[in-house]
Amino acid sequence: HLSGITPALSYNCRRLIDKAIKAAKKLGLTVSFDPNFRSTLWSFETARDVLSKYLPYVDVLIGIEPIHVYNADGTDVKDGLTMDPSFEDMDRVFKAIDEQYHMKAIARTVRYVHSGSNNSLKAFYYADGKTYESKTLNFEIVDRVGGGDAFSSGLIYALMQNDWKHEDIVNFAVASSVMKHAIRGDTNITSVGQIKRLMNNASFDVQR
């Protein structure tokens, strides 16, 4: 798994990621990638140019910015995409990415901010030529740090379960992220069972 933060840290980190992602692909490993742009580390334009070069080696893409995916006319397929995109728009974008890079899975979260302490989260997910939309979960925030990583780790875990339906994969990833928002610190210290209970509409209760 690769994060877009690492190549932003230094030129040497960038060179290391270049070598690692190519070596992983050569070995037949599944490569997951979260572009994860941080404006405090580099410009959007530089990040887009660098991170987009990794796409031919990526199997699972988690997030669609700041990469570029060009149409035949040179425009980006994501141009005009809102913060609350429709299912049809996400389906169009996912299919355009898949057409160019032939990925196993693509995911993108959508966050609704109701207040500083109350948000909702859902995700769109693409696999096997079809787009899926998760349930929308509402939650109170204890600590937002690590929510994106919890989504990524939840998605990766779910993808490793060979018998899970696509709907369960995306709903598990969203529930994993939501669960992290109730836990202080960077790490999602919870269990698969707790995430599944939340995924299946059980009460939001972090059990210690």
Where do the protein language model's features map onto the residues?
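Conserved post-catalytic alpha-helical subdomain immediately downstream of the catalytic base
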Residues: K135-N201, V206-R208
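Ribokinase/PfkB-type carbohydrate-kinase core domain
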Residues: H1-T131, L137, W164, N188, ...
